[in-house]
Amino acid sequence: MQALTNPFPIGSSSLIHCMTNEISCEMLANGILALGCKPVMADDPREVLDFTKQSQALFINLGHLSAEKEKAIRMAASYANQSSLPMVVDAVGVTTSSIRKSLVKDLLDYRPTVLKGNMSEIRSLVGLKHHGVGVDASAKDQETEDLLQVLKDWCQTYPGMSFLVTGPKDLIVSENQVAVLENGCTELDWITGTGDLVGALTAVFLSQGKTGFEASCLAVSYLNIAAEKIVVQGMGLEEFRYQVLNQLSLLRRDENWLDTIKGEVYE
């Protein structure tokens, strides 16, 4: 894809602050390490700013939200906004939780670099009809035409922010560009935390100076292409999970991996 340039080798071992849930915490930490950066996970309000101030990117994931974690999230997001620290917000569960949806809308005032979610979550957030249950997307919510138009309008309201919408076809929308990407495999939906991992990888690429649009395209494509290489081998679910990290660490050695991205970028 001509609009993207290879981010590897990683130029500096950036510190990525992930405020995420306990379920996917280990996967995110190892995924960040596999790309050559360093993870830290701190969500106690008493120390959250100490770690955020040392970081080169911030990833906020709303899984397992609590009152204390919400306080820490708001503190970190405020600092990121004031210091121009790249920030990714993953709108997990906004289809079900009014508390999470309200928090995400408040976080928009802190101007995240990337707002991420699955098709159902983003449709819910922008006020479109959706069928999402829990934290999962519905197959009924994969229509992108109406969503694309609304996201273009939101990008004008929140200039500088990109939307990363995951699904069978991944949609990335910024003020001036739209990407529709088609790599991936259904096996990624069978293990928990892969969606969260996309957000963490987006933060990694943001820490290397990529724009929100570029970082989103790179992150979702990198994970999807790594997974495609595993599926070719054929294996059980636990082995597939194990091999995800292997391929994340190996794919960056392939100087031509960008050539395997399937999709289009529109100006």
Swiss-Prot record:
InterPro entries: Hyethyz_kinase (IPR000417), Ribokinase-like (IPR029056). ATP binds at K116, T166. It catalyses: 5-(2-hydroxyethyl)-4-methylthiazole + ATP = 4-methyl-5-(2-phosphooxyethyl)-thiazole + ADP + H(+). Gene3D superfamilies: 3.40.1190.20. CDD domains: THZ_kinase. Keywords: ATP-binding, Kinase, Magnesium, Metal-binding, Nucleotide-binding, Thiamine biosynthesis, Transferase. GO terms for molecular function: ATP binding; hydroxyethylthiazole kinase activity; magnesium ion binding. GO terms for biological process: thiamine biosynthetic process; thiamine diphosphate biosynthetic process. Catalyzes the phosphorylation of the hydroxyl group of 4-methyl-5-beta-hydroxyethylthiazole (THZ). This is Hydroxyethylthiazole kinase 2. It comes from Streptococcus pneumoniae (strain P1031).
